[in-house]
A protein has these predicted regions:
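Structural motif
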Residues: 240, 410, 427-429, 448, ...
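Nucleotide/phosphate-binding sheet-loop regions of phosphoryl- and nucleotidyl-transfer enzymes
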Residues: 1-391, 418, 424-427, 434-439, ...
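Glycine-rich phosphate/ribose-binding loops and adjacent secondary-structure elements
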Residues: 332-334, 431-442, 446, 454-460, ...
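Extended, non-globular alpha-helical segments
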Residues: 396-436, 487-525
Length: 877
């Protein structure tokens, strides 16, 4: 019989694939002797089985779970569902990768009217009675919300109404009698919403709760988070069942969340929050704003001293910063969870360097422990120092996720999406965020919440996304119904500007200028380590000297893609280019192109100068001509006048350029075949610029790489290459200099990959244009795929957007085939990638595996690619 259930005493940290992260760490803490309430874990395989069985828990799994309950009863001396000495449990999810706020928790399971009455009868203390009713109403509320999907808001409204009637501000101020009434109201609300009574049998409660955790693996929030974080659907989640310890028992109890180092800065100091007389959910959900962890020392000196020891033990054991949840019940400490803590990119770099300096990690291990995707956030804007000095903060919350944000106020995630789609920059202002808000949080420049601490949902999710966040600004008076809030006497309506500083927590009215980030010393240190290990070169996609300069600062070793068409759109050149398009004869076309030549030459010269002898790959004209022609009446008239043609004639030419499927139309090398004069002009510009820069800097190795786009047949490449080589050689001879250059091609049509052995005979290099290669392989266009991709995610046909994360099974197979066919024919062939995928870590890893020479990505993703390339090389060892 298969083992579906493991006691905490039966597992360890190596079993996270089976027990999930939380279960494996609870087992590990048990094995090193830390105070963990002893329970059991239902495996991730049971979750997969649940889905295979049509979303049902089979009898075998349930029977093993009940055996686990019996073991818990033995260890704890209490009985599940017993009236005299009841065992109450918590049910929590735990996937193998941490997914904050995505999966749901149920506390105090096992309570019903009889158990509650018996518990109170056995202990006449009024404080105990209050505790029992508090635990009961929490259980009904959580069970209804998480297991039965009755919205939390119905219960929150009842609590708010009760507090109003009693004239109190906090839940803790409600009496036992108030909470007893609330529990009755909650059960009535449950029946009203679902048409059946609240389940009173603890075994039924447990089964429903386990099913709910498994079910939540497939909730929309979990699916979005998984897609953003490369977590496969097939992993499933485990379920952890453990005896309750009560932080809300009395004033000798409490609950907290802590980090062994500061998750925002990485500084080596204990950082966290503690709430007296509360349950864990209160801290994480951010309903009450807690006190800093250091204050716990005054309240519970013995438990605090033990906790400090536990922190040291865990950090020395895991060799990484730990995020821990704990409860104190009657002054006794219990550990409920530990995991490697989520951290900002700044903190990740500092912690990695410190762990190397402290002897916990090697350089290679330090490089491997940083998530490359988070490096993006280091390059985030900060407020301009002078503008900041002149501004006065209106209020202050907690600086929960660094960076500076400025935008228009919106009050719901839906509004954030609508406004952002119109190109507006928005700041999402909420009482507190919940996992349902994730889509709005993703598009916002920043997030501001009234409630919640540094470990609330808003804070954790914002840090993960690299979005600026200020949480827990209790001075804000919120009026969600009318979409406005008041702070320091000033009213902010939807659409008003606000600026927030996620580092200091300051909130400002109006707009404050932001500036690009400065990169700290640890960044350079970690990047130097990464460069030591990686084998892949990293280039950038850049069309302007400014982009190229930025990319060089971030460590780019060349330009892997310069798109020449962007240079045609500038005011002074577009007119000449339009004349070329509307010309009738080769001579007319050549005359128009002659006007553009000096501009192109100047552009290339500036790029060569910015790269100081590092390689520059220049892609010849790619888009279809209709993209360049005028659409406005005035522009059409201007063009007609310049060419001495009638407006009618010009309009006819424009109409003739219309294509039904321009993506597969008259573009790329097809333009150079029909209009070789375009390729001639571009070649002259490339070679003349190179000669000029070579003369000025004889110590640089200026070697142009000319790239012919959209080749699908070797004869096309031969034809265009002949034009390029004849033109280039004539230019070099005329100048009386020596200059080496290369002619290569983009591999972006499946047929090019399939016939790469033929094409390699004519090409000096291949560069995979994976944006087009993905479109052509899947047969859907990048601009239209958005209409149906969401349905594909919902139905699990796709788990990822193939335009963001390289499809390794299909597109990847074509790439591998092209390399295997091309290299034997032309051993000198060098191969790169220049689609958007060049900056995606999992795609970079794949490129390393199949033997590419370089990846090329946008300037700000260069550090991501450098780190991902190093991690791929380290993992291979």
């Amino acid at each position: 019989m298969k083992k579906w259930v493991y006691l905490f005493s039966e597992g360890d940290m190596t079993m996270r694939n089976l027990l999930g992260g939380k279960g494996a760490n609870l087992a590990e803490m048990t094995s090193i002797g830390l105070p963990v309430p002893q329970g059991f874990t239902i495996t991730t395989e049971a979750c997969t089985q649940y889905y295979e069985d049509g979303r049902k828990i089979n009898d075998e799994i349930m029977a093993q779970a009940m055996e686990g309950v019996a073991e818990m009863e033995k260890i704890n001396g209490k009985k599940f569902g017993d009236l005299k000495n009841p065992l109450l449990v918590s049910v929590r999810s735990g996937a193998r990768a941490s997914m904050p706020g995505m999966m749901d928790t149920i506390l105090n399971l096992g309570l019903n009217d009889e158990v509650v009455a018996a518990m109170i009868a056995g202990n006449p203390d009024p404080a105990f009675e209050r505790f029992v009713y508090d635990s009961y109403r929490r259980f009904i509320q959580m069970f209804s919300d998480v297991v039965m999907e009755v919205g939390k808001k119905y219960f929150e409204q009842l609590i708010d109404k009760m507090k109003e009637e009693k004239g109190v501000k906090y839940d803790v101020d409600l009496t036992a009698a108030d909470l007893k009434v609330l529990a009755e109201q909650f059960k009535a609300e449950y029946k009203n919403q679902l048409g059946k009574d609240f389940p009173s049998d603890p075994v039924e409660q447990l089964k429903l709760a386990i099913e709910a955790v498994f079910r939540s693996w497939d909730n929309p929030r979990a699916n979005v988070y998984r897609r953003d974080n490369d977590i496969p659907y097939s992993w499933g989640t485990a379920v952890n069942v453990m005896p309750m310890v009560f932080g809300n028992l009395n004033n000798e109890s409490g609950t907290g969340v802590a980090f062994t180092r500061d998750p925002a800065t990485g500084e080596k100091k204990l950082m966290g929050e503690f709430l007296k007389n509360a349950q864990g959910e209160d801290v994480v959900a951010g309903v009450r704003t807690p006190m800093p962890i250091a204050q716990m020392e005054q309240e519970f000196p013995e438990a605090y001293a033990e906790f400090i020891k536990v922190c040291e033990t865990l950090e020395n054991h895991y060799h990484d910063m730990q995020d821990m949840e704990f409860t104190v019940e009657n002054k006794k400490l219990y550990m409920l969870q530990c995991r490697n803590g989520k951290r900002t990119a700044q903190a990740a770099l500092k912690i990695a360097c410190d762990l190397v300096d402290e002897g916990h990690k090697t350089e290679a291990e330090a490089v491997a422990m940083i998530d490359p995707r988070n490096l993006d956030t280091l390059l985030h804007p900060q407020f301009d120092a002078a503008a900041l000095k002149a501004a006065t903060p209106l209020g202050k919350g907690l600086g929960a996720s660094p960076g500076a944000a400025c935008g228009k106020v919106v009050f719901t995630a839906e509004d954030a999406e609508v406004w952002a789609a119109k190109g507006e920059k928005v700041v999402l202002v909420r009482l507190e965020t919940s996992p349902e808000d994730i889509t709005g949080m993703k598009v916002a420049q920043g997030i501001l919440t009234v409630r919640g601490g540094m470990t609330s949902h808003a804070a954790v999710v914002a840090r993960g996304m690299g979005t600026c966040c200020v949480s827990g600004c209790g001075e804000i008076a919120m009026d969600e119904a009318n979409k406005k809030f008041t702070l320091a006497g000033q009213v902010f309506n939807e659409g008003d500007y606000i600026s927030i500083d996620g580092t200091t927590g300051n909130i400002y009215a109006g707009q404050i200028k932001t500036v690009d980030a400065q990169i700290a010393g640890e960044f350079g240190r970690v990047m130097a380590w990464a460069d030591k290990y990686r084998k892949l070169k990293v280039r950038t996609n850049a069309d302007t000297p400014a982009d190229a300069k930025k990319a060089r600062e971030l460590g780019a070793e060349g330009i892997g893609l310069c798109r020449t068409e962007h240079m045609f759109f500038e005011e002074d050149r577009i007119a000449a280019f339009r004349e070329m398009i509307c010309s009738d004869t080769v001579e007319e076309r050549e005359a128009a192109l002659e006007k553009i030549l000096p501009y192109q030459q100047g552009d290339f010269k500036a790029l060569y100068e910015a790269l100081e002898g590092n390689p520059v790959t220049i892609r010849f004209l790619d888009p279809p001509l209709h993209e360049f022609v005028p659409t406005e009446e005035a522009d059409i008239e201007k063009l007609a006048k310049a060419q001495g043609k009638s407006v009618e004639t010009i309009k006819n030419i424009i109409a003739s350029l219309h294509e039904f499927n321009p993506m597969m139309g008259h573009r790329g090398c097809r333009l150079a075949v029909t209009y070789p004069e375009i390729a001639k002009m571009q070649t002259k510009a490339v070679i003349r610029a190179a000669i000029e820069v070579q003369k000025a800097h004889p110590d640089w190795n200026v070697k142009p790489e000319i790239m012919i786009p959209l080749v699908c047949e070797v004869k096309e490449l031969k034809f265009v290459k002949k034009v390029v080589v004849e033109t280039a050689d004539a230019e070099i001879a005329a100048a009386g200099v020596k200059l080496e250059y290369e002619v290569g091609t983009m591999i972006e049509i499946p047929r090019a990959a399939l016939t790469a052995d033929e094409i390699a005979k004519e090409a000096d290099f291949f560069c995979f244009g994976t944006n087009d290669l993905t479109q052509m392989t899947f047969g859907f266009s990048r601009d239209d795929a958005g209409k149906f991709l969401n349905a594909y995610y919902d139905t699990k046909i796709f788990e990822n957007d193939p335009f963001a994360k390289l499809d390794q099974t299909g597109v990847g197979k074509l790439m591998e085939m092209a390399i295997k066919l091309g290299k034997p024919v032309n051993p000198k062939l060098h191969v790169g990638i220049c689609g958007e995928h060049g900056g995606d870590p999992s795609s970079v890893e794949f490129c390393h595996k199949i033997g590419l020479d370089y990846v090329s990505c946008s300037p700000f993703r260069v550090p991501i690619a450098r780190l991902a390339a190093a991690q791929a090389a380290i993992a291979e060892k």
